[in-house]
Amino acid sequence: MITIFNKLKQSLSKTSNTISAGIDKIFYKRKLDKETLNELEELLISSDISISVVTHIIEEFKNVKFDKTIDSDTVKEAIAKLIEQQLSKSEIPFTLSENKLNIILVCGVNGVGKTTTIGKLSALYSAEGKKVAVAACDTFRAAAINQLSSWVHRANALLITGKASADPASVAYRAIEESIKQNIDILFIDTAGRLHNNKNLMDELSKIVKVIKKLDENAPTHSILIIDAITGQNTYNQIEYFNDVTNLTGLIVTKLDGSAKAGVLVGAVQKFNLPVYFIGIGEKIEDLKIFNRHDFSRSLVGL
């Protein structure tokens, strides 16, 4: 049986193979000196680990190991520990309130796997005995509601929809009222996939947030941005724009199994001080995993 850690290693292989092979090549019978450190710096930056994080790693190597012969496994172990330290703020649990409705706003650009992720989350919490509902606020795209309906049905959750082309904020409002009536534990609000620089769509998202707060000034419980690891450095722009509109509480990172740019997660956490609640490492429902910074850091460098 494949373990969660081994599954994670497989998912990160496109990134970790590059980093691991690069480290092996750089430190084959060589000292840790200025030349090898420059090569290591270039390797890590090319894997989309942010410059600030890479600079910190290089400085730590200078302080501890400079001008000494070192093997590649020792380098990988050291990098993994340093990356884990940089991710110290990433492992905040995805907490839910008891005996009240938890409103979870889920947003993201087109194609990041937002609807699929909501389906997986619905299945996860339904299996734990929670009453789950999903508000289909992507009202202008019929295919989105059909896709969501399939996932929600599999998760044994309640789907709340509006009429075609209905105001998304009105659907969110009705979904909250209906969820309160039915004693729902968790309501996921699925918003339209939008480009972060499309003002009209971002205004629509802002309106949904205002409607939620009319019903509960402390809501939403969580505002989650779904990002995919394939995006690379553009992830930073997405987080910045969506955070301005929704005051994000955390991230879910998808498509780690298809990306050679998984290192971007490290820089995103370090730059925005946002936790990573879950990561997607495959297409199956069970492939949405709680983020573990220790396992991620080691897998990223091929350990």
Curated annotation (Swiss-Prot):
Keyword Membrane: yes
InterPro entries: AAA+_ATPase, P-loop_NTPase, Signal_recog_particl_SRP54_hlx, SR_rcpt_FtsY, SRP/SRP_N, SRP54_GTPase_dom, SRP54_N_sf
One GO term describing the cellular component: cytoplasm
Alphabetical keyword list: Cell inner membrane, Cell membrane, Cytoplasm, GTP-binding, Hydrolase, Membrane, Nucleotide-binding, Receptor
Binding residue positions for GTP: 108-115, 190-194, 254-257
MF terms (GO), sorted A to Z: ATP hydrolysis activity; GTP binding; GTPase activity; signal recognition particle binding
Protein name per the record: Signal recognition particle receptor FtsY
Organism: Rickettsia prowazekii (strain Madrid E)
Gene assigned in the entry: ftsY
